[in-house]
């Protein structure tokens, strides 16, 4: 595993450490994983229009962090948009979190950004499959 700079040059080699068992109930983990899968594949999923037809099963969750600001210079700014997930579903090799400040809704703004990361990482040509755009969180 490695980290690249913004010009795709190797910045440093990363050595992953084994995850520590935190004692979560395996059934609870399974329920969360199924929910993340539904969010990206079920007809009612908030990012299913982005990830549902992607050739590698990606799972994740959209979000919109609401902002309450009373300062005059900050009025009118939009909510923060985010999407976090991983793939492939059955054997994850990449985790992506996209946070777009003042972006609006996660399913509309952040999920497409995350999709581009998955496309690049897995070498998937965007023209090789069809993806619709979702419009809700």
Can you say where each PLM-predicted feature lies in the sequence?
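Active-site beta-strand/loop architecture of penicillin-binding DD-peptidases
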Residues: 1-20, 27, 36-128
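Short, highly charged C-terminal tails/helix-capping segments
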Residues: 129-137
């Amino acid at each position: 595993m490695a980290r690249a700079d913004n010009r795709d040059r190797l910045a440093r080699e990363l050595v992953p450490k084994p995850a520590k068992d935190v004692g979560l109930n395996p059934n609870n983990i399974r329920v969360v994983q199924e929910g993340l899968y539904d969010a990206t594949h079920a007809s009612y999923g908030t990012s299913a229009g982005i990830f549902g037809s992607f050739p590698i099963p990606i799972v994740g969750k959209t979000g919109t962090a609401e902002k309450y600001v009373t300062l005059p210079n900050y009025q009118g700014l939009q909510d923060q948009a985010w999407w976090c997930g991983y793939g492939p579903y059955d054997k994850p090799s990449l985790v992506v979190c996209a946070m777009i400040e003042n972006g609006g809704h996660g399913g509309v703004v952040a999920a497409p950004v995350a999709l581009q990361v998955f496309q690049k990482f897995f070498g998937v040509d965007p023209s090789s499959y069809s993806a619709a755009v979702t419009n809700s969180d």
